[in-house]
Amino acid sequence: MRTLFLSPSYLCNESCVFCPCHKIARRYTPVPIDLILSSIDDAMLRNNIEMVLISGGEPLLYKDLPKVINYAKQCGLKIGILSNSLKFADENFTQDFIEIVGNDFELTTAFHSCISDEHDSITNIKGSFEKSLRGVHCLIKSGVKVTIKYVINGLSYMYLPLFVEWVYATFPDTVSFVICNIDLCGEALENSEMTAVPFKESKQYLEKALDIVIKYSENGRHRNVSVFNTPLCTIDPYYWKFLRKYESEETMDALLLPSADSASPSFVRYDLKGDGGANFAPCAECCVQEICPGTWRQTAEYFGDSMFNPFN
């Protein structure tokens, strides 16, 4: 699906140790609403986009977010939001938000552990686990399509099977579940000694987690479960049916704030290639390269070519 990625602000109400953004990026002034709306127009004319995906920082802190959503909807575009859902813990806020923009958008919230103290230690915000959980339940109650996301990280990867059990015990099967390998950039790279985990170490926990998904499915619990940023050569082929490429990986436009080391103004970057995939030296020798999701570029650079086991 042709997508425009919007990052209107890097301001956030959490401070996750493996955030892909640098903390210094929060200093940038949010993108003006007029620039965002004109960027939607331009992306529609130039590339016939079908969806707007809004991230951050925390997009709910951007005061003009409802205007962005309603404008995109008027243009016939689908809306996706990546949010920690802390603000949705307030039922009154959620009701007001839904009254303004409707409930026909998709929202993804990441939980970093099913153990509240562990999650809070990663976000550096005490009580964030319970608030995000309340927020997600408020959204589900309001009819919003919700996805729960887990990023495989060095601090909690060994609890991934337990996390899967928690997802099935906590959320209805209409809630999708995605597992992603970590993008080692920004704060994640700065804190790599505790955030990075080699694929060979997380493999057994990921496979056990997917065994649990299969068990639930066989018992009639059918949930949309996907795994991203995971090369085929790092997991048993039995589990390949769960691995996905991002739909927008080869077809994304983006309106981004400048990077932490740049003073350039925001502008739309068109026809961006995904920052990764199966494009590394060992991948060229692999017979399944064309169907492989690959992984993040900086993650592959961090672990080196030895992480790959190409199929010949």
Give the role of each language-model region:
Residues A25-R27, I115-I122, G186-N191:
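A short acidic, helix-capping loop that chelates divalent metal ions and anchors anionic groups
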Residues M1, A254-N312:
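Radical SAM enzyme core and accessory elements
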Residues G56-G57:
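Active-site beta-strand/loop signature of hydrolases that rely on acidic residues for catalysis
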Residues F18, H22-A25, Y239, Q289-C292, ...:
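Secreted/processed peptides and extracellular or luminal domains of membrane proteins
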Residues L37-L53, Y62-N181:
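Radical SAM/AdoMet-radical enzyme domain recognition
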Residues I36, I125-H137, K141-D271, D275:
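Radical SAM enzyme [4Fe-4S]-AdoMet core and its adjacent flexible, acidic
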Residues M1-L35, R46-N47:
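Canonical Radical SAM [4Fe-4S] cluster-binding loop centered on the CxxxCxxC motif
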Residues C12, C16-C19, C233, C283-C286, ...:
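Disulfide-bonded cysteines in secreted/extracellular proteins and peptides
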